[in-house]
């Protein structure tokens, strides 16, 4: 059984969610919210990959995979004249609060371990200890 996908933290939700070529097309690609966030952090903000991964609360490898997929979709749309729809994904908007499953302390998500007892056994308070935020970001 595969591991559940952790939510990716995003700090930006787009106002415009659909872009199409001047000559209408029925073909489109769907860019997930976390893919747009990866593009924003790396290409627009100019952050290093490690900083981007920390902001999104994913590993560097996962961040790289998200970024590659986003760039591939955007290139496909531009080269082949497809529309881009931005929606969906597994993400949480803003900051989650986390709880230490060892001592029960609730703290900000910027920590990777409990600031009280230094346990790494932590989870998102939205998921009752574990972060299974599937669809939290769907609007």
From Swiss-Prot:
Gene3D superfamilies: Winged helix-like DNA-binding domain superfamily/Winged helix DNA-binding domain
Protein family per UniProt: Belongs to the UPF0251 family.
Stated name of the protein: UPF0251 protein Csac_0224
Species per Swiss-Prot/TrEMBL record: Caldicellulosiruptor saccharolyticus (strain ATCC 43494 / DSM 8903 / Tp8T 6331)
Classification lineage: Bacteria, Bacillati, Bacillota, Bacillota incertae sedis, Caldicellulosiruptorales
